[in-house]
Amino acid sequence: MFSNLQYNPAFAGQTKMINAGLLAREQWTGLKSAPSTQVLNGDMWFKFGGLGLSVINDRLGYEHSFRFNALYAYHYRLSNKMQVSAGAGLGIINKSLQGSQLIYVSQNDQNAITTDISEYNANIDLGLSIVYDKLIAGVSCTHINKSVKASDFTTPPRHLWIYAKYSYTLNDLIKLQPSLLLKSAFFKTQLEINTNCLLKDKYWVGLTYRHKESVVALIGIQLNQHIKAGYSYDLPFGPIKGQSYG
């Protein structure tokens, strides 16, 4: 859960530093043409808010998706402990499919895509967030310019995201950071529940549960004040259990 800029532009510039993050996810590594995702996020604070960018490259078999978003967030401090933010993201999405490589069970399928296609579309994201003491929460809508009914392969439907995280200090050595992420395309919803344990403000271990999909183990280290690195390992269950790992 270190990539919240990709789904909520209101998080841009919430810390008075220049931030950059790179995330790579290789799913179902025991299977051919398994999902592969790379995410690059960056943001910075300035006097009138926050600026950022989010780049996502995603591949699944013969399907490829690329998204670039420029982000802006306005932050308003209500008190020493509370800040509310509103953000917007504007960018492009490219979706492509090697339809000529697909094999269909029925040769008479009227919905079959048999040629290679690639299309660019505009993308708009909107989000809100609140920081109160040790609580961070946000709600956002991505691809807001496309309804579920108007969407198709090249234009993803709008998604709703709800995020919350709380940081609890047990003692001078240990902090617990439980969080949850709910994401919904309205016809499909997924819930992630996560807990990270931060040791000496330098090392962390964590566990994530994705409803009806997988359990994820996480480890990481804060290399210095500005750089941290982490690794996660998925333990899937359901239909792909025993056929994939990592």
Regions found by a protein language model. Give the residues of each.
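Subset of outer-membrane beta-barrel
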Residues: 1-246
